[in-house]
Amino acid sequence: MFYRLTWLFARFMLFGVVRFRIETAGREHLPSSGYFLVGAAHRGWMDPFVVIHALPTEPRAWFLGSGPSTFTAPWREVLIRRLGGLLPVWRGGVGIDKHVESARAVVGNGAVFVQMPEGTVSGPAGRIGPFRPGAMLIALRTGAPIVPFAMAGTEELYMGRRMASRILPATTVSGLVSDWGGVRPEEGSREELDLARRATDALAAILGPVVEQLHPLTVDPPDHPRRFRRKLTWFFLRPGRLDRE
């Protein structure tokens, strides 16, 4: 109940007041039932809202994200927790095993686990940054289907900003690494990390061109008014109390 009400309020603010516009394609590629892992390109703080906008209300989405970047004010923490669960990552905190355990708990309950393999906002507009293998390690150990999710237009925000997203057909680690025989390497081994890196490179090769295709759809003319550009772009990215501790 609170989740639906919070999402309705967020939709009103983002799409009614600020007038963000999102063009989403490929919803037919979402698995019809059961859990899955979303591997999404990362452009800005609006990205989780773009993902939630594209997904059905149920099952609920859980995000692996930066704790210091999110919990910068009590109201932000409440908003994020109400809209979708957050599994926070802290500097010098737990390793991949703990994140895999959390991801297993999420998918084990039939929910959606979302991770952005870039790990941070990086790369120029319209291009993805380097991908890290953590998401594919989680996919490998949980067996969750992987839904590639491309988006563009969230790196710079202003009133009426156009954005675009595209959901690609679901795949698996074996689908990304065609010559893998399907025998899982020992957890924590070099072989497992190498396999995850190969799957990560394959996912980046899929998402990169789609992000480049979507980017022109979000570009406004140079003389287009960009009201509140600085405030909106940095709305959720300002340093907070946890960054200073």
Where are these predicted regions, by residue range?
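Short, highly charged C-terminal tails/helix-capping segments
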Residues: 214-240
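Soluble catalytic domains of membrane acyltransferases
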Residues: 20-194
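Short, amphipathic alpha-helical "lid/cap" segments that border enzyme active or binding sites
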Residues: 6, 10, 100, 104, ...
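C-terminal non-catalytic accessory extensions
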Residues: 242-245
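A contiguous, mid-protein "functional segment" used to position or interact
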Residues: 182-219
